[in-house]
Each structure stands twice: as C-alpha cells, then as structure tokens.
Design a protein with these regions (language model features):
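Short amphipathic alpha-helix used as the core "switch/output" element in two-component signaling
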Residues: 46, 68-80
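Alpha4 helix (beta4-alpha4-beta5 surface) of REC/receiver domains from two-component response regulators
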Residues: 69, 90-106
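Hydrophobic/aromatic residues positioned on beta-strands within the core alpha/beta folds
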Residues: 86-87
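C-terminal output helix
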Residues: 94-95, 112-122
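Acidic, metal-coordinating helix/loop segments flanking the phosphotransfer/catalytic sites
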Residues: 37-55
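The feature encodes the CheY-like receiver
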Residues: 21, 63
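Acidic catalytic/metal-coordinating carboxylates
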Residues: 39-40, 66-69
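Active-site residues of response regulator receiver
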Residues: 59
Length: 146
C-alpha cells in the first residue's frame, strides 16, 4: 500500500534533526510526493498559514517545542490535518497515548524500517479519504506497538 493519490501528495516534516528531515524528504520525493521540512516547531504556524499540506510528520522530542504541544497546536489550527508521529522515543505507551490524545492520527517509531512509516502514511491518508466521503473514521494507525 502506498500514499499514491496525487490529491494527498504534500507532506510537511517537522523534525529537529536535519539528517532525518532530509532523509524523509528524499525518501518521499523518490516516491513522487512533494515535501517541505522544518527543523523548528516554532516555524510551523507561519508555514501552515501560508502553505497547504495534506499530512504532517512530527517528531516528539525537539528542543524548542515538544511534539505533544506542537500536535495540540496544529490540531487547533487545522482540525482536519492528518498528523503522524515519527519518533525516536520508540514504543513508549505513555508517549503514544499522549500523542494520540493531543490529536495525532498515527504513531511510528524511528527504529522501525522506513517502510513502516510509509504504510502508516498510506493508512492515515486512506482514512482521511473515507472521512471526506463521510464514511466513519478508523482507529489511529500505530506501528511498533506491541
């Protein structure tokens, strides 16, 4: 499964590690998607007010703003924006539930193969398409959960 619908091809990546952000941009662009990366969560509000994206990929641990607070802020700013957590925290049940309560639609550990993130993105996008067609939404998509 892949997020191949061109309607959902714009990704926003928010990760304080420039290497990971660059890797994700390269990986997704190689699959035909467009991407923009921010390495500072504080840039998110101004970027989202001027640009569109179909999915945000958010790290949880960042120095200037934590991912949970950022997810809550993004959810207030755009209630329908799909948000997927991509984190080095690993499978931490407390962090995962905090992210989901804040409004994340998916959760993937960075220690899993990158294909897991791509599968979660595909499922989250499929769920969003269902919502647009007024079909009841599915549960959050998790990767790395025991």
């Amino acid at each position: 499964m892949s997020p191949s619908n061109r309607e959902y091809s714009q990704f926003l990546i928010i990760d304080d590690d420039p290497g990971i952000a660059k890797f994700l941009v390269t990986y997704l662009r190689q699959r035909g998607h467009t991407c923009h990366a921010l390495t500072d969560g504080f840039q998110t509000a101004s970027w989202l007010s001027e640009h569109d994206c179909e999915v945000a990929i958010v790290d949880l641990r960042m120095p200037k703003v934590d991912g949970i607070s950022l997810i809550s802020f993004m959810r207030e700013m755009n209630p329908s924006l799909p948000i997927v957590v991509f984190t080095g925290v690993g499978y931490d049940e407390e962090q995962m539930h905090a992210a989901l309560r804040a409004g994340a639609n998916g959760y993937v550990s960075k220690n899993l193969p990158i294909e897991q993130l791509y599968c979660v993105l595909a499922r989250v996008l499929a769920t969003c398409q269902q919502r647009k067609r007024s079909v009841p939404s599915a549960q959050p998509v998790l990767a790395g959960a025991a």
